[in-house]
Every structure is written in structure tokens, then in C-alpha cells.
Design a protein with these regions (language model features):
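Beta-strand-rich recognition domains
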Residues: 18-58, 74-153
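Positively charged n-region of N-terminal signal peptides that target proteins for export
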Residues: 1-4
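Aromatic sugar-binding surface patches on proteins
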Residues: 63-77
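Alpha-helix boundary/interfacial micro-motifs
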Residues: 15-16, 63-64, 104
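Bacterial N-terminal signal peptides
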Residues: 6-15
Length: 153
């Protein structure tokens, strides 16, 4: 550690700036998993469309907004995948069954690295359409009293 501080000072003299993670901001990585057979689905995280369409199984890897990889990502990827932030976040899910008589089950799950259970879990079989909006808090480490947001429709 004694060598790291002077080395950082030398790098900063040449214009290097520490990343958000190096400066102490936690790094968040999550997986958004959607089993949307028989449904059209739209998922937004903090107002950003995650690019989920439904009709199949889809997964998205999500990161915090100031993740160091965000700088290298194409703007469209950055807008869909680098959407998480420390503290309060919002997830919105809109869905419609493509065939109201279908017995397909929709499942939308947001799993955060280091958390014991999904942060958010939606399961719907009975409703032909719906819109759910929930808020969740991200912090590292996961709170001891963490409870998953579970919606069954």
C-alpha cells in the first residue's frame, strides 16, 4: 500500500484519473433474465430500455453507470447495459400475452452479484397483461435484512 499511493501520484501528474471503482464507488454487476415465451415484454431500469422484447428466453448483463467498461462501450450498449447506480433504482416491466388462452408463464428476474436471492422476481401466468413498477436499493455488501421483491400475478 505504501508504494501504491506515490505511484498513483506519479500517474496523476501525467493526467491519469482514478476510476469510480478505484475512488471507492462500489461496482455492481447484475443479470436480467426474462423467460418471455408467449409474451411481448418491455423492461426498463432507471428509465432506460433494457432491450428485452419477449417471445423467447433473454438475458442481459447489467453494470453500474460509471463502470470503467462503459467508456469503451458503444452508445447503444452503454444505454442498455450500464444503468445501475448505488442506492435507489427503479425497474418497470410491461407485458402482454400474445395468446390470451395460452398457459405460458412469464418470469422476469434481476439477480445482483453478491446477493442471496434475486433483487426482483416477477412471475405471471393468470393475467393477460400488466405493468409493474418497483424500486429497489443496491448496496455493497448486501444488507443483512435483504428481502427480494417478489410479484406473483
Amino acid at each position: 500500500m505504501k508504494t501504491f499511493i506515490p505511484f498513483c501520484m506519479i500517474l496523476m501528474a501525467f493526467g491519469w484519473q482514478p476510476t469510480a471503482q478505484a475512488a471507492g464507488t462500489p461496482e455492481y454487476m447484475a443479470v436480467l433474465a426474462v423467460m418471455g415465451y408467449g409474451y411481448t415484454v418491455k423492461v426498463s431500469i432507471n428509465g432506460a430500455d433494457a432491450g428485452v422484447k419477449g417471445g423467447k428466453s433473454e438475458n442481459r448483463r447489467l453494470f453500474n453507470q460509471d463502470h470503467e467498461m462503459a467508456k469503451q462501450a458503444l452508445p447503444a450498449i452503454r444505454a442498455q447495459n450500464f444503468v445501475l447506480k448505488p442506492g435507489e433504482n427503479r425497474i418497470a416491466v410491461e407485458y402482454t400475452k400474445t395468446d390470451p388462452k395460452s398457459s405460458d408463464t412469464l418470469e422476469v428476474k434481476l439477480e445482483l452479484e453478491g446477493y442471496p436471492e434475486p433483487v426482483f422476481l416477477l412471475q405471471s401466468k393468470a393475467k393477460s397483461s400488466g405493468k409493474i413498477e418497483k424500486q429497489f436499493v443496491l448496496q455493497k455488501p448486501a444488507p443483512k435484512d435483504f428481502k427480494s421483491i417478489v410479484v406473483n400475478e
